[in-house]
UniProtKB/Swiss-Prot annotation:
The keyword Cytoplasm applies. Belongs to the ferrochelatase family. It comes from Propionibacterium freudenreichii subsp. freudenreichii. CDD domains: Ferrochelatase_C, Ferrochelatase_N. It catalyses: Fe-coproporphyrin III + 2 H(+) = coproporphyrin III + Fe(2+). Fe(2+) binds at residues 178, 267. This is Coproporphyrin III ferrochelatase. It is found in: Cytoplasm. SUPFAM superfamilies: Chelatase.
Length: 352
C-alpha cells in the first residue's frame, strides 16, 4: 500500500525535431533571452537535427525506475511530463486524473535547490492541476525535495570518475554545473545560498571516496550554459575560461564531470562535447567528458529506494515531513518576476 497513486517524472523538456525548435525556444526564453542568443541556440539544435537527447533519456530514466520499483513490490503508474515540450505538465496531469489517479508524487531530474531547478516546477505543477467544482485542486501533487545528498549519487559519480582516472591518472578534474544568476543562487533553498554548497558537498563526498581508493586528482568547480542578458551577473568561472587558464598553467589533460546534470541535455552535448572540447583542442589539451549518471544501475537503485520511502510516507506526517525538515518551504527559491506565485508543496522522504 502506498500513499501515492502515481509517479510523475517532470523534466525541462526539449525538441525532438527541427520543426519543434522555434516554439520550444520561445517557451524557454519567455522573451527574456536576447534574439541573437536564441538564434545561436537554434543553430546548435540544427547540428543535431533538432533533437535534444533529454526527453529520450528521461523516458529511459522513468522506465528504469519503474522496473526497480516493481522489483521492490511497488507497481504504480509512471508518467513523463515537461515544462517546455510535450507532454506538458497540464496534459500529463489531466491524463493521470482521467485514469482515476488522485495523489501524485513528482520527481524532477535536477537534485539541487534553485528557482529554475525546483520552485519553477512546483509552480507549474500547481498551475497545471485542474480545479474541481468546489474550487479545490482535483489532484494532490507534491514534488520530492532536492536530493543532492543522495548517497547513490555520490557512488555513481565515483564509479564514473574512477574509470576516467584509470585512463587519465594525471588529469585535472573540472566539475561543471549549470550557471544561474547570482541573485538566484543567493536565494536558493529555505535559508538562501544553498545551490553552490550543495554542489560542493557532493564534490567533497566524491573526492573523499576517490581518496579512499588512492585517487587524489586536483579539482575545481566551473559553470556552463549561461544565458539571459549579459548585464545580469551569473555564476562564474565559465568552463571555457577555466580550460584556457589551465592551459596557461601547464595542464595538459582535463576530465570534465557534469555533476549538475543527471542526464544529457543540449547543454551537455553542445556546451561540453562541442564547445569545451574545442577550447581544449585549441590549447592542445586532452579532454574527457564523463558520462551523466542517467540509468547507471547504482544510481537507479538508490533513487528507487528514495522513491519507495516517499511513496510509503503520508504527506505532512512523520519525523522528516516537510515542516520538520524545513526544506521546500512556501517562500524558498523565490520567483524574481512574480513574487508569491503559489506552488505545490515539497515533500521529504525521510532521512538519508
Amino acid at each position: 500500500m502506498t500513499s501515492f497513486d502515481a509517479l510523475l517524472v517532470a523534466g525541462f523538456g526539449g525538441p525532438e525535431s527541427m520543426a519543434e525548435v522555434p516554439d520550444f525556444l520561445q517557451r524557454v526564453s519567455g522573451g527574456h533571452i536576447p534574439p541573437d542568443r536564441l538564434a545561436e541556440v537554434e543553430h546548435h539544435y540544427a547540428r543535431f537535427g533538432g533533437v535534444s537527447p533529454v526527453n529520450a533519456q528521461h523516458r529511459a530514466l522513468a522506465a528504469a525506475l519503474g522496473e526497480a520499483l516493481v522489483a521492490r513490490g511497488i507497481d504504480v503508474p509512471i508518467a513523463n511530463a515537461n515544462r517546455h515540450s510535450m507532454p506538458y505538465m497540464d496534459q500529463a496531469l489531466a491524463d493521470l486524473q482521467s485514469r482515476g489517479i488522485r495523489r501524485v508524487l513528482t520527481l524532477v531530474p535536477t537534485p539541487y535547490a534553485s528557482y529554475s531547478g525546483c520552485r519553477a516546477y512546483r509552480e507549474e505543477l500547481l498551475a497545471g492541476t485542474r480545479i474541481d467544482d468546489e474550487g479545490r485542486p482535483a489532484l494532490q501533487v507534491v514534488k520530492l525535495d532536492p536530493y543532492a545528498d543522495l548517497p547513490a549519487l555520490v557512488t555513481a559519480q565515483v564509479q564514473l570518475l574512477r574509470a576516467a582516472l584509470a585512463d587519465h591518472p594525471d588529469a585535472h578534474l573540472v566539475f561543471t554545473t549549470h550557471s544561474i544568476p547570482t541573485a538566484m543562487a543567493e536565494t536558493s533553498g529555505p535559508h538562501g545560498n544553498a545551490y553552490i554548497p550543495q554542489h560542493l558537498a557532493l564534490i567533497d563526498a566524491v573526492m573523499a571516496e576517490l581518496a579512499a581508493l588512492g585517487l587524489r586528482p586536483s579539482w575545481e568547480l566551473a559553470y556552463q550554459s549561461r544565458s539571459g542578458s549579459p548585464r545580469t551577473p551569473w555564476l562564474e568561472p565559465d568552463i571555457n575560461d577555466v580550460i584556457t587558464r589551465l592551459a596557461g598553467e601547464g595542464v595538459r589533460d582535463v576530465i570534465c564531470s557534469p555533476i549538475g546534470f543527471l542526464t544529457d541535455h543540449m547543454e551537455v552535448v553542445w556546451d561540453l562535447d562541442t564547445e569545451a572540447a574545442a577550447t581544449a583542442a585549441e590549447h592542445s589539451m586532452a579532454f574527457t567528458r564523463v558520462a551523466t549518471v542517467g540509468t547507471l544501475p547504482v544510481f537507479i537503485e538508490g533513487l528507487a529506494d528514495l522513491i519507495v520511502a516517499a511513496l510509503s510516507t503520508k504527506p505532512g506526517t512523520g519525523p522528516d515531513a516537510p515542516a520538520a525538515r524545513h526544506w521546500c518551504t512556501p517562500d524558498c527559491c523565490p520567483n524574481a518576476r512574480i513574487a508569491g506565485r503559489p506552488t505545490i508543496p515539497g515533500f521529504a522522504a525521510g532521512p538519508r
